[in-house]
């Protein structure tokens, strides 16, 4: 495990919280940029007022009686 050598330089009690904070800030930044760009607002603004989908049910055709000879 070559990546495990980082903990010889940085203590896990310091490195793990910094890594988790970095991941959380990156996620907030990405979502913020998508929201400002309008990619999240386009469907989010319509979500609370969305109407249920209209489903049309078609009756099954009646079976055709077989001719008896």
Swiss-Prot record:
Residues 1-14 are cytoplasmic. The keyword Metal-binding applies. Gene3D superfamilies: Light-harvesting complex (4.10.220.20). Coiled coil: none annotated. Keywords: Antenna complex, Bacteriochlorophyll, Cell inner membrane, Cell membrane, Chlorophyll, Chromophore, Light-harvesting polypeptide, Magnesium, Membrane, Metal-binding, Transmembrane, Transmembrane helix. It is found in: Cell inner membrane. GO terms for biological process: photosynthesis, light reaction. GO terms for molecular function: bacteriochlorophyll binding; electron transporter, transferring electrons within the cyclic electron transport pathway of photosynthesis activity; metal ion binding. A bacteriochlorophyll binds at residue 31. It comes from the Bacteria. The keyword Transmembrane helix applies. Antenna complexes are light-harvesting systems, which transfer the excitation energy to the reaction centers. Belongs to the antenna complex alpha subunit family. This is Light-harvesting polypeptide B-800/860 alpha chain. It comes from Rhodocyclus tenuis (Rhodospirillum tenue).
């Amino acid at each position: 495990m070559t990546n495990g050598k980082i903990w010889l330089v940085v203590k896990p009690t310091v490195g793990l919280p910094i890594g988790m904070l970095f991941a959380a800030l990156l996620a907030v930044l990405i979502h913020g940029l998508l929201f400002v760009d309008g990619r999240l607002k386009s469907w989010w603004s319509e979500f609370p007022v969305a109407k249920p989908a209209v489903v049309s049910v078609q009756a099954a055709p009646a079976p055709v009686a077989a001719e008896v000879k």
